């Protein structure tokens, strides 16, 4: 999870005096990175994936809070064999979470694609070596009853000093200082606990104020006009059919699937960054896998907005609710959100009109970058990141060598969690310019995760080689991200997408370049010359020098994604919703009780380990590769 260092971290009140220093030297470090790497060229197409896992107790289906113990054992393998280890393991926010990546980057496409699924499978096996007989790991996006009574093993006390949550004990937080410091400092910076609000699914027996009744035993909880979001009657948390959550763990405790790609040079990285931005909401909808939160069926299908709200550190001034006295900017988004601007490249496909959002950026940072030869688009991108405060400052890493270190830059960069991330090379490294695709939700099986990993890698190469053009206005990308959260958006809703992905239109109205399409139309085409992204990928694959085995497997992955887009194969969110609604213990009141959760998690385990095959989410067994 982002930039992690060793050492003691500063509490917010101790950090404040260093904020400007960190920002100032972060800019200096950024300029050094650009100066040293602006002409860097890397030959190989290196790439990789990140998969996040949760640990559960098989006896009671509670979250098992000992992932850090298992992680220590896994990382010991890496220390013993740093150059030959098959997998790398890193801490994630939850004490019940582990993040796994390949031990070394994948290189190119071709036969390399045959190893993706086996690598994911061996990752599971690697973790399972250290599990107790009553423990399992799962790749599910959200644990259904997170925040309900006694949902962890061991049990913890709520209202702890770090999160001050009514629902989550501090014991769910990874013991590494970064995570507790992030949690406390976000809360302190914003001036109170985070306030996460999402719509509840309204079933026929769902009470209007169900969450408030369960939480406060009042309807609504407290009626007053104070500024406290938990007591203000106008607050979203007090609205009917609302699910309220109050801690970073509700968001950062969700699991995702991410892919990162090294491009030949800075210009290609800028191109891929821009082209993946409009693709991101589509991938969120296509991978939607989270419909239960805090023990309730929600009316959304994806995690992104929950994480966005869970780390929103904006205070009243930055939210525009009070005059700017102690802060510089009114900021329109959480620091975990969609991108705010394209960064352009030498490609002729970019037009300034696509950046139609009123970008908030630090003009002093922008001017310094401009004065040092950074172009306007890239300067605005980084100056936008620097409107945020650093959240985690290590006490022994404040005064460092800006020529050799990038800690202060990464402090800012790594806590701007956006749908796509533009990643400069680290210092003194052979690593090149990279782009990270971040919105995808983790899937139940290694095949499903491999399908999306492979698809995204081939798409990135196709963007480069075919000069694909997905540009639409940034505001339309934002609308698409909102749409992606809707229940069953993958089959029910329409998204803005470019009509012709092969042409550039240097003149004329950009409104004529895009239209509303379903996910099925975007991926499987509308007939005629419009083959959709699946058709583009299939045509592109035919030009590559794949052997028969690779071609057969890749076509299985592509077929799976095509059927997910058409609705023939259900999304995990839709399947989850139907599982709950058809469960004999469900009372059509939106409540997912312990019995339902136990059966649901057991079904997830059975599918992920191959005990049960469910064609509704896995497709035809003949098309599945195990």
Curated annotation (Swiss-Prot):
<dbReference type="GO" id="GO:0004357">
    <property type="term" value="F:glutamate-cysteine ligase activity"/>
</dbReference>
<protein>
    <recommendedName>
        <fullName>Glutamate--cysteine ligase</fullName>
        <ecNumber>6.3.2.2</ecNumber>
    </recommendedName>
</protein>
<keyword id="KW-0436">Ligase</keyword>
<comment type="similarity">
    <text>Belongs to the glutamate--cysteine ligase type 3 family.</text>
</comment>
<dbReference type="GO" id="GO:0005524">
    <property type="term" value="F:ATP binding"/>
</dbReference>
<keyword id="KW-0221">Differentiation</keyword>
<dbReference type="GO" id="GO:0010628">
    <property type="term" value="P:positive regulation of gene expression"/>
</dbReference>
<keyword id="KW-0317">Glutathione biosynthesis</keyword>
<keyword id="KW-0547">Nucleotide-binding</keyword>
<keyword id="KW-0067">ATP-binding</keyword>
<dbReference type="GO" id="GO:0006750">
    <property type="term" value="P:glutathione biosynthetic process"/>
</dbReference>
<dbReference type="InterPro" id="IPR004308">
    <property type="entry name" value="GCS"/>
</dbReference>
<keyword id="KW-0217">Developmental protein</keyword>
<dbReference type="Pfam" id="PF03074">
    <property type="entry name" value="GCS"/>
</dbReference>
<dbReference type="GO" id="GO:0030154">
    <property type="term" value="P:cell differentiation"/>
</dbReference>
<dbReference type="GO" id="GO:0007346">
    <property type="term" value="P:regulation of mitotic cell cycle"/>
</dbReference>
<comment type="function">
    <text>An essential enzyme in glutathione (L-gamma-glutamyl-L-cysteinylglycine, GSH) biosynthesis, GSH is essential for growth and differentiation to prespore stage. Catalyzes the condensation of glutamate to cysteine.</text>
</comment>
<comment type="pathway">
    <text>Sulfur metabolism; glutathione biosynthesis; glutathione from L-cysteine and L-glutamate: step 1/2.</text>
</comment>
<dbReference type="InterPro" id="IPR014746">
    <property type="entry name" value="Gln_synth/guanido_kin_cat_dom"/>
</dbReference>
<dbReference type="GO" id="GO:0030587">
    <property type="term" value="P:sorocarp development"/>
</dbReference>
<dbReference type="GO" id="GO:0030435">
    <property type="term" value="P:sporulation resulting in formation of a cellular spore"/>
</dbReference>
<dbReference type="GO" id="GO:0046686">
    <property type="term" value="P:response to cadmium ion"/>
</dbReference>
<comment type="subunit">
    <text>Monomer.</text>
</comment>
């Amino acid at each position: 999870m982002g930039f992690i260092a060793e050492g003691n971290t500063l509490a917010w009140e101790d950090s404040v005096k260093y904020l400007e220093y960190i920002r100032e030297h972060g800019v200096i470090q950024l300029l050094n990175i650009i100066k040293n790497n602006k002409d860097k060229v890397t030959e190989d197409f290196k790439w990789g994936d990140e998969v996040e896992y949760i640990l559960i107790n098989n006896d009671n289906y509670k979250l098992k809070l000992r992932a850090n113990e298992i992680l220590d054992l896994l990382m010991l393998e890496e220390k013993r064999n740093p150059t030959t280890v098959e997998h790398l393991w890193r801490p994630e926010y939850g004490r019940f979470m582990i993040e796994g990546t390949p031990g070394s980057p994948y290189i190119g496409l071709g036969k390399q694609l045959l190893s993706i699924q086996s690598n994911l499978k061996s990752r599971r096996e690697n973790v399972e070596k250290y599990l107790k007989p009553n423990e399992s790991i799962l790749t599910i996006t959200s644990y259904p009853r997170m925040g309900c009574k006694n949902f962890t093993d061991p049990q913890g006390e709520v209202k702890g000093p770090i999160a001050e949550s009514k629902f989550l004990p501090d014991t769910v937080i990874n013991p590494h200082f970064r995570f507790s410091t992030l949690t406390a400092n976000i809360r302190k910076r914003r001036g109170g606990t985070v306030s996460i609000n999402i719509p509840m699914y309204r079933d026929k027996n769902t009470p209007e104020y169900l969450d408030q009744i369960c939480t406060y035993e009042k309807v609504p909880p407290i009626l007053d006009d104070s500024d406290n979001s938990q007591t203000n009657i106008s607050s979203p948390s007090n609205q009917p059919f609302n699910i309220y959550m109050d801690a970073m763990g509700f968001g950062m405790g969700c699991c995702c699937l991410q892919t990162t790609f090294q491009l030949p040079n800075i210009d290609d990285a800028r191109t891929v960054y821009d082209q993946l931005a409009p693709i991101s909401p589509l991938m969120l909808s296509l991978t939607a896998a989270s419909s239960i939160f805090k023990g309730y069926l929600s009316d959304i299908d994806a995690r992104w907005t929950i994480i966005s709200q869970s780390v929103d550190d904006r205070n009243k001034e930055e939210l525009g609710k009070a005059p700017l006295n102690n802060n510089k900017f009114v900021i329109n988004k959480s620091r975990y959100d969609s991108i705010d601007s394209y960064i352009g490249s030498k490609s002729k496909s970019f037009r300034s009109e696509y950046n139609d959002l009123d970008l908030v950026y630090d003009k002093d940072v922008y001017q310094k970058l401009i004065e040092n030869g950074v172009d306007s688009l890239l300067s605005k991108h980084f100056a936008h990141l620097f409107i945020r405060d650093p959240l985690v400052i290590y006490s022994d890493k404040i005064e460092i060598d800006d020529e050799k270190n990038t800690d202060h830059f990464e402090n800012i960069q790594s806590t701007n969690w956006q749908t796509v991330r533009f990643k400069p090379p680290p210092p003194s490294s052979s690593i090149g310019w990279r782009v990270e695709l971040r919105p995808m939700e983790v899937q139940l099986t290694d095949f499903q995760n491999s399908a999306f990993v492979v698809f995204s890698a081939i798409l990135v190469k196709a963007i480069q080689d075919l000069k694909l053009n997905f540009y639409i206005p940034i505001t339309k990308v934002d609308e698409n991200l909102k749409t992606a959260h809707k229940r069953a958006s993958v089959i029910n809703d329409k998204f803005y997408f470019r009509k012709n992905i092969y042409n550039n239109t240097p003149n004329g109205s950009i409104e004529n370049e895009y239209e509303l399409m379903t996910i099925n139309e975007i991926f499987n085409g509308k007939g005629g010359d419009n083959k959709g992204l699946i058709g583009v990928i299939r045509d592109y694959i035919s030009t590559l020098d794949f052997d028969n085995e690779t071609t057969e497997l890749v076509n299985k992955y592509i077929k799976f994604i095509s059927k997910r887009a058409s609705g023939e194969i259900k999304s995990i969110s839709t399947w989850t919703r139907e599982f709950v609604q058809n469960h004999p213990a469900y009372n059509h009141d939106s409540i997912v009780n312990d019995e339902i959760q136990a059966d649901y998690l057991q079904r997830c385990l059975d599918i992920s380990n191959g005990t049960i095959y469910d064609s509704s989410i896995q497709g035809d067994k003949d098309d599945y590769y195990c």
